[in-house]
Amino acid sequence: MPKIIELPEVLANQIAAGEVVERPASVVKELVENAIDAGSTQITIEVEESGLSKIQITDNGEGMAQADVAMSLRRHATSKIKNQGDLFRIRTLGFRGEALPSIASISHLTIVTAADGEVYGTKLVAKGGEIESQDPISTPVGTKITVENLFYNTPARLKYMKSLQAELAHIVDVVNRLSLAHPEVAFTLLNDGRQLTQTSGTGDLRQAIAGIYGLTTAKKMVEISNSDLDFEVSGYVSLPELTRANRNYITILINGRYIKNFLLNRAIFDGYGSKLMVGRFPIAVIDIQIDPYLADVNVHPTKQEVRISKEKELMALIKSAIAQSLREQDLIPDALENLAKSSTRGATRSVQTSLPLKQTNLYYDSSRNDFFVTPETVQEDIKPLVSKSESSVSLVANKQQPTVKQAKRSADDSDSEHGKLDYKNKSKLKRMLENLTNEETSTFPELEFFGQMHGTYLFAQGQGGLYIIDQHAAQERVKYEYYREKIGVVDSSLQQLLVPYLFEFSGSDYISLQEKMPLLNQVCIYLEPYGNNTFILREHPIWMKEEEIESAVYEMCDMLLLTNEVSVKTYRAELAIMMSCKRSIKANHALDDYSARDLLVQLAQCKNPYNCPHGRPVLVNFTKSDMEKMFRRIQENHTSLRDLGKY
């Protein structure tokens, strides 16, 4: 009796679904790509319970004829390719004919569609891949696909789904990438009836960037363009002053398809050269048009990995495009922004924005902000600050109408000598935290400061001889113990902000942070949703200096986004290490005598003054005996050959 049999089609589709449909975001990606291939200009994505309960995609594309609807659920049935030659000239996003039958096999699926020229449309209902009914229906041209009870017959897959907020963040990220890849399509994303994302579909990529990442970010993006006989590269990259803590803000597109490619990422970084700080990444949208014959997209189930011929030439093209665009820009950060931070708070902030200070719901509020920015709005220059007298008049005139300040991400000032905390290296981080927890109080010698070298090292003398102190490591230790005490046992005292801050994030980060907000609350940072992917901060803990608020809150949020699961205790410890490093004086910074002596006094009061939080030494000691040996005032006793002969 034969042992090898052909699997039933439904079972084969369920197996394929394991590769194609990883989570609700995979369903959104596949169905939206089909809608784009159908020539849609308007696509609406509606989800309930982050897509696990319901996903509905509505488009105004060409629709399907009645005879094609049932065929679309057959495996490898597609209108995209017809022969082997088409496989090497793929210009559509889908082509295998696997996605729709795979999705149907693990859900309850309803298709309502109508093609142009047909009297009636078609409604098809399927459960677990089996068609239950197909009837004519009156419906406009286009397609509406509803996926309900996803993974209902694959409980193991459903069991390992993440939280609703995490799954929703993945959906938002997919829609954002597709919006950047196809700015000519108007996208609308709704979750439980509330609008999360909407793009205008004008075809202007900068407008799409503004809609997804915010107007402030779009203003700091520069256009790139380059081409040769095989490739055409265009898009936008951020100025070096605008960076993020991870690569998630880099979008690489090939013929309208979002891909992941390490070497092309490397080319983007090379284009910046030394302009990027260590551990920081730019925001970039790189659109690559290529002859389909040079790209093989049939190498991965999700089609996000592409093999490219002449990849080195493409890397060089991207690198030169970015380098050339940055050379043409004025890369000196706007000094007015720094002046505004150091000048009188009310006089400068009162003219920076006119957003009303009010509570709003979790999602986009159309009455508060105009989502559809115009090219003129995006391109406009930042208006110069008004004079001091004008500011004073404005402050008096508007004292009854509070305003908010848009928080800005400061240029990264991490110390390359001490490196960057690797939050994903759990074993290394655990050892570091254990060492810091087990520190014992020790005595510290009395030191008399007498000089500084290269703005980096302090010289002091004591009974033990000469001491050389690394000023950055010393202050890092002082600040670490300060933050560890303030953050570890949080003082719940809060200071009300006269002018609240607005913190803007991408859609997916905004949703992820909502889920992790209790951790921020544990360190007395209370961010309230303000709509349009923005949080508002109305008060701050008294241990945090007001001038640190903008950078510190963004750094805290970036740390949360980089970690998957972390306890409150670990988060507080990591936060103390990060803030102590960021807030400490750096090398090549000259200290006056008073500041140097004060630093040594503070260092002597530390529980462990000998090492920075990363474990590096704070100071080294040369005893009087060491010095005398170096100058050969004391010489080692020489052993004679006669003495050696005795042994």
Curated annotation (Swiss-Prot):
Identify the species of origin.
Answer: Streptococcus thermophilus (strain ATCC BAA-250 / LMG 18311)
User: Could you give a single Gene Ontology term from the biological process aspect?
Assistant: mismatch repair
The name this protein carries in UniProt is: DNA mismatch repair protein MutL
Q: Which Pfam families does the record associate with it?
A: DNA_mis_repair (PF01119), HATPase_c_3 (PF13589), MutL_C (PF08676)
Origin: domain of life:
Bacteria
What SUPFAM superfamilies does this protein's entry cite?
A: ATPase domain of HSP90 chaperone/DNA topoisomerase II/histidine kinase (SSF55874), DNA mismatch repair protein MutL (SSF118116), Ribosomal protein S5 domain 2-like (SSF54211)
UniProt GO molecular function:
ATP binding; ATP hydrolysis activity; ATP-dependent DNA damage sensor activity; mismatched DNA binding
Its family remark reads: Belongs to the DNA mismatch repair MutL/HexB family.
Membrane-crossing segments per the record: none
Gene of origin?
Answer: mutL
Q: Where is this region: Disordered?
A: 393-423
**Alphabetized InterPro entries for the sequence:** DNA_mismatch_repair_CS, DNA_mismatch_repair_MutL, DNA_mismatch_S5_2-like, HATPase_C_sf, MutL/Mlh/PMS, MutL/Mlh/Pms-like, MutL_C, MutL_C_dimsub
